[in-house]
C-alpha cells in the first residue's frame, strides 16, 4: 500500500518505467562512444557528441521542473517528453555527419532529460512516508540497464554497430508506452512551512550548495568512465562481449545494494554515505586508470559501482527529498539532474581532450582527484546529523 491516503502503490507500473528508462541508458553508456567511433570520429569529436546530451541535462530539467511544480502536471510532462524523445531521435536515420548528429543529440536529449526528475517526484509522491522503499523500485532500472548491456552487447558483436540506432529507438518507444501506464499520484496538501520557505531559501540552507557542487564533481569524475571505458578496454584487448559483461557486473553490484539500501539508510547518515561514495569513487578511478589490464582488478573496480553510483544516488535522492519537501520536489530533483548534467558534460569534454593528449592514466587520475575533493568538501560542510 502507498503511504498516501491508503491508496495501493502501483509497484510494477513504477518499476516498469524505471526498467525501460534505464534500459536506454544501458544502451547509451557503454555503446554510444563505440557507435561514434564506428562512424570514424576521433576522440575529441566523440567527447563533444557525448557531452551534448549532458549539456542538455544542464538546461532541460530546470525548465521542466519549474513547469511541473507550477502546474502540477508532472505525469503529462513525463509522457510528452518520452514520446518526443523517440520522435526526435528518429532523425538519426536521415544523416550521419557531425553537425547533424550534434543536432539530434541536442534535440532528443532536451526531451529525454525532462523525464526522469519529474518521474522521481511522482515516485516519491506515491511512496509518501515510505520513501525508504525507493531503492526497491529503482532497482528495476538497474535490471533494465544490465539486460540491455548484455543483450545489446551480444547483438552488436554479431550484427555490427549498424543496428545500434534502431535498437535505441525501440527502447525509447518502450519508455513512452510505460509512461502511459503509470497512474497519477494522490494529491497531498502542502505543509504550512513549505509555503513559508521558498525554493531559493531552501537552496541556500547550510550544506545544500556544497551538496550540489559535489553532485557535479561526482559526475565530472565519471566522465572518462562513461565516455571511454569501452574504448579503453578494447585497446587493452578485451572483446565486446566481455566488455558488456563487465558493465553488467557493476550494475549487478548496484542491484544487490538496492535490495538492502533501506536497511543501510537506517544505519548510516546521509553524510556518511555520501562521503564514503566519493572516497570509493576516487579509488575506483585510480584502479581503472592504472590496473585495468588485470582482469581481477577490473572486476573489483566494477563491483565498486555499487557505491559510486548506487549508494550515492539513493543518498542524494533522499537528501533532496528532505531539503525541498513536496512543494518544491520537482525543482529540487531537477536541480540535482542539472548539476549532474553540468558535471557529466564537463567530464565528457575534459576526458575527450585529455584522452587524446595525455592518455588513460592521467585522465582517470583527474577523475580521482575530483572525487577526493568532493569527499573533503562534504565532510566539512555537511553536519553529522545529515
Regions inferred by a protein language model and the residue ranges of each:
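Juxtamembrane intracellular "pre-TM" segments in multi-pass secondary transporters
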Residues: 2-8, 182-215
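Cytoplasmic helix-loop-helix junction between adjacent transmembrane helices
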Residues: 106-140
Amino acid at each position: 500500500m502507498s503511504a498516501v491516503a491508503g491508496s495501493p502503490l502501483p509497484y510494477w507500473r513504477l518499476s516498469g518505467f524505471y526498467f525501460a528508462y534505464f534500459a536506454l541508458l544501458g544502451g547509451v553508456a557503454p555503446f554510444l562512444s563505440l557507435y561514434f567511433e564506428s562512424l570514424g570520429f576521433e576522440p575529441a569529436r566523440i567527447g563533444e557528441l557525448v557531452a551534448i546530451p549532458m549539456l542538455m541535462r544542464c538546461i532541460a530539467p530546470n525548465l521542466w521542473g519549474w513547469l511541473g511544480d507550477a502546474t502540477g502536471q508532472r505525469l503529462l510532462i513525463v509522457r510528452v517528453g518520452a514520446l518526443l524523445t523517440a520522435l526526435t531521435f528518429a532523425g538519426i536515420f536521415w544523416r550521419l555527419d557531425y553537425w547533424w548528429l550534434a543536432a539530434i543529440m541536442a534535440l532528443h536529449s532536451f526531451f529525454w532529460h525532462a523525464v526522469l526528475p519529474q518521474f522521481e517526484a511522482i515516485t516519491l509522491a506515491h511512496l509518501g512516508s515510505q520513501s525508504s522503499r525507493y531503492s526497491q523500485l529503482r532497482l528495476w532500472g538497474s535490471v533494465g540497464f544490465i539486460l540491455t548491456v548484455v543483450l545489446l552487447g551480444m547483438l552488436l558483436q554479431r550484427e555490427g554497430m549498424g543496428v545500434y540506432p534502431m535498437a535505441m529507438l525501440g527502447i525509447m518507444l518502450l519508455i513512452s508506452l510505460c509512461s502511459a501506464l503509470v497512474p497519477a499520484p494522490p494529491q497531498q496538501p502542502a505543509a504550512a512551512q513549505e509555503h513559508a520557505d521558498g525554493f531559493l531559501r531552501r537552496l541556500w540552507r547550510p550544506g545544500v550548495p556544497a551538496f550540489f557542487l559535489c553532485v557535479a564533481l561526482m559526475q565530472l569524475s565519471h566522465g572518462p568512465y562513461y565516455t571511454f571505458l569501452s574504448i579503453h578496454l578494447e585497446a587493452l584487448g578485451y572483446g565486446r562481449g566481455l566488455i558488456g559483461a563487465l558493465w553488467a557486473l557493476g550494475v549487478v553490484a548496484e542491484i544487490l545494494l538496492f535490495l538492502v539500501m533501506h536497511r543501510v539508510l537506517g544505519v548510516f547518515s546521509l553524510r556518511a554515505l555520501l562521503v564514503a561514495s566519493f572516497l570509493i569513487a576516487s579509488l575506483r578511478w585510480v584502479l581503472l586508470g592504472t590496473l585495468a589490464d588485470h582482469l581481477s582488478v577490473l572486476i573489483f573496480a566494477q563491483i565498486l559501482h555499487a557505491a559510486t553510483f548506487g549508494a550515492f544516488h539513493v543518498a542524494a535522492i533522499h537528501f533532496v527529498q528532505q531539503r525541498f519537501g513536496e512543494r518544491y520536489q520537482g525543482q529540487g530533483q531537477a536541480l540535482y539532474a542539472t548539476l549532474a548534467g553540468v558535471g557529466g558534460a564537463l567530464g565528457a569534454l575534459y576526458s575527450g581532450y585529455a584522452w587524446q593528449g595525455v592518455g588513460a592514466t592521467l585522465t582517470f587520475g583527474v577523475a580521482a582527484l575530483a572525487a577526493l575533493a568532493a569527499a573533503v568538501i562534504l565532510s566539512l560542510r555537511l553536519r553529522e546529523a545529515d
